[in-house]
């Protein structure tokens, strides 16, 4: 949406260079429907994750701390979805005022950064736990995990400040509608470029490289261990799970990141073709649905890699209450993979033990 400023009358009045871009009847039906589905599935799934990890698993391991915070971040975002569903159903006419415009926009930005940072830390934690379990034991403590999560929430809040500052309600004169949008003055190109690059680099590229590196090193270490044990089927399982984790993250976010970059070019006037603007504005809410729906499934996806999580999750669905006493498991692992190599790979003759459990 390319916007030009016109006047100031309480709510700032602007002109839309491409007033029909992204405004299609099927979008006004499809996107609110998808938002509603994401809201129901996400609230239900992430609430169950919080209950299972906190009340059943007693929040005893580093991985469980990261997953709990991931679910909480998703819940914060999901609470804003009804607002965006109504906004889209009303054909991009914002009825909620300027304050809720800022809060709802910050909620989207906050979830992006918090979720990506938490997934990145989770991948680093898995690398340390699986490849260097002895060396990292003193660093991978509950206190360190909780402090890390506090820092992540603060960083995500800081990264969301531009949405609070620069997202506002505007009245578009040539469409006679009130919108909640970013609006950049034509002479100020630094801000949109900075925000776009921050979202692309800090919110995707840098975390993806860390996640890719961490799980590649995990796979290499486990592959070496399983070659010693001559356990090829298990090695194939490892590869499939790790590939699923990396590809799940990449394909969830890459469409949104690409169209975010194109949107910045439109805002700057680098792209002036209204046909391209229409494609971008039409695709943007669809990429948001893809990214955030997968985001909201992440706690379930990672949790179900663990046998104990699945066990307690099914107990919860059957209304079996958690035991009063916490379990005494000392495991600090996260998935159905069944070997945790020590720093000395030659000591892998014993029977495998689970290494991706959130126990």
Curated annotation (Swiss-Prot):
Q: Which residues cross the membrane?
A: 26-55, 62-89, 99-125, 142-165, 191-216, 240-268, 279-304
What is the recorded post-translational modification? C-terminal Ser or Thr residues may be phosphorylated.
Which Gene Ontology terms of cellular component type are present? external side of plasma membrane
Q: Which family does it belong to?
A: Belongs to the G-protein coupled receptor 1 family.
Q: What does this protein do?
A: Receptor for angiotensin II, a vasoconstricting peptide, which acts as a key regulator of blood pressure and sodium retention by the kidney. The activated receptor in turn couples to G-alpha proteins G(q) (GNAQ, GNA11, GNA14 or GNA15) and thus activates phospholipase C and increases the cytosolic Ca(2+) concentrations, which in turn triggers cellular responses such as stimulation of protein kinase C.
Q: What is this protein called?
A: Type-1 angiotensin II receptor
Quaternary structure, from the entry:
Interacts with MAS1. Interacts with ARRB1. Interacts with FLNA (via filamin repeat 21); increases PKA-mediated phosphorylation of FLNA.
Cellular compartments annotated: Cell membrane
Report membrane topology: Multi-pass membrane protein
Q: Name its species.
A: Meriones unguiculatus
Q: Which Gene3D superfamilies does the record match to this protein?
A: Rhodopsin 7-helix transmembrane proteins
Q: Which gene encodes it?
A: AGTR1
Leader sequence range is none
Q: Which BP terms in the Gene Ontology apply to this protein?
A: calcium-mediated signaling; immune response; maintenance of blood vessel diameter homeostasis by renin-angiotensin; neutrophil chemotaxis; positive regulation of cytosolic calcium ion concentration; regulation of vasoconstriction
Positions of S-palmitoyl cysteine lipidation = 355
Key words, A-Z: Cell membrane, Disulfide bond, G-protein coupled receptor, Glycoprotein, Lipoprotein, Membrane, Palmitate, Phosphoprotein, Receptor, Transducer, Transmembrane, Transmembrane helix
Which parts of the chain does the record assign to the membrane side Extracellular? 1-25, 90-98, 166-190, 269-278
User: Which InterPro entries does the UniProt record give?
Assistant: ATII_AT1_rcpt, ATII_rcpt, CCR1-9-like, GPCR_Rhodpsn, GPCR_Rhodpsn_7TM
PANTHER family annotated for this entry? Answer: CELL ADHESION MOLECULE (PTHR10489), TYPE-1 ANGIOTENSIN II RECEPTOR A (PTHR10489:SF956)
Query: Which residue intervals are topologically Cytoplasmic?
Result: 56-61, 126-141, 217-239, 305-359
User: Where is this chain glycosylated?
Assistant: 4, 176, 188
Annotated residues for binding of angiotensin II: 15, 17, 167, 182-184, 199
Cysteine pairs bridged by disulfides in the record? 18-274, 101-180
Molecular-function annotations in GO: angiotensin type I receptor activity; angiotensin type II receptor activity; C-C chemokine binding; C-C chemokine receptor activity
């Amino acid at each position: 949406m390319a916007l030009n400023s016109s006047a100031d009358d309480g709510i700032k009045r602007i002109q839309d260079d491409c007033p029909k871009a992204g405004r299609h009847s099927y979008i006004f039906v499809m996107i609110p429907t998808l938002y509603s589905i994401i809201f129901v599935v996400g609230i239900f799934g992430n609430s169950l994750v919080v209950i299972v990890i906190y009340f059943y698993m007693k929040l005893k391991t580093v991985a469980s701390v990261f997953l709990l915070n991931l679910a909480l971040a998703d819940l914060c975002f999901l609470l804003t979805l009804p607002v965006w569903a109504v906004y889209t159903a009303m054909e991009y006419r914002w009825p909620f005022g300027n304050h809720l415009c800022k809060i709802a926009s910050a909620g989207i930005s906050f979830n992006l950064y918090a979720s990506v940072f938490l997934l990145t830390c989770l991948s680093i934690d898995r690398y340390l736990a699986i490849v260097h379990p002895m060396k990292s034991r003193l660093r991978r403590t509950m206190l360190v995990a909780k402090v890390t999560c506090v820092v992540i929430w603060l960083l995500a809040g800081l990264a969301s400040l531009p949405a609070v500052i620069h997202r506002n309600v505007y009245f578009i004169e040539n469409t006679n509608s009130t919108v909640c949008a970013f609006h950049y003055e034509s002479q100020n190109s630094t801000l949109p470029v900075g925000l776009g690059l921050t979202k692309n680099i800090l919110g995707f590229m840098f975390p993806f490289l860390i996640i890719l590196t961490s799980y590649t090193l995990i796979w290499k270490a486990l592959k070496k261990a399983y070659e010693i044990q001559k356990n090829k089927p298990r090695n194939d399982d490892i590869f499939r799970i790790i590939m699923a984790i990396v590809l799940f993250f990449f394909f969830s976010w890459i469409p949104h990141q690409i169209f975010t970059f194109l949107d910045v070019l439109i805002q700057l006037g680098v792209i002036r073709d209204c046909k391209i603007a229409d494609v971008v504005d039409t695709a943007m809410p669809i990429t948001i649905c893809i990214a955030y729906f997968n985001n909201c499934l992440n706690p379930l996806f990672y949790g179900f890699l663990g046998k104990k999580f699945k066990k307690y999750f099914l107990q919860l669905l059957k209304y079996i209450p958690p035991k009063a006493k916490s379990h005494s498991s000392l495991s600090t692992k996260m998935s159905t993979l069944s070997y945790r190599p020590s720093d000395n790979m030659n000591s892998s003759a014993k029977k495998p033990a689970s290494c991706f459990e959130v126990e």
